[in-house]
Amino acid sequence: MVGRRLSGERGAASVELAVTFPVVLLLVMTLIQVALWFHARSIALGAAQEGAREGRVQPASTARAETAAEGFLDQTASDLLTGRDVAVAGSPTSIEVTVTGTSPSLFPGLSGWSVTQSAVGPVERPTP
């Protein structure tokens, strides 16, 4: 009697699907949220590295570093990094660019996850 079902099992598949589907959907959305956060981190790191690369060229300039990082974000971030801010700190020997922002959220009512990435580079100095 392999193909016969017991009368008490009728509709069991529908109940199982109704219970497991929301859990699976939540898991998939959480994985996508994590992927968006990692992508936003990658964009922030790229902007920080671009700013540090531009700012360390002789003559070193924190304004040029900030402009380069902002330009990178304008070209690549669109809506993937919101509330973004670029902070540049320079010393005679190094320059540090920090990019902060928020990744988008897939869950209504919840804010995205915070993103902070920094890049430091030595200031180029001509030597005789």
Regions found by a protein language model. Name each.
Residues 1-68:
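Alpha-helical assembly-interface signal, strongest on the long, hydrophobic N-terminal helix that forms
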Residues 2-3, 62-128:
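Short, conserved structural patches
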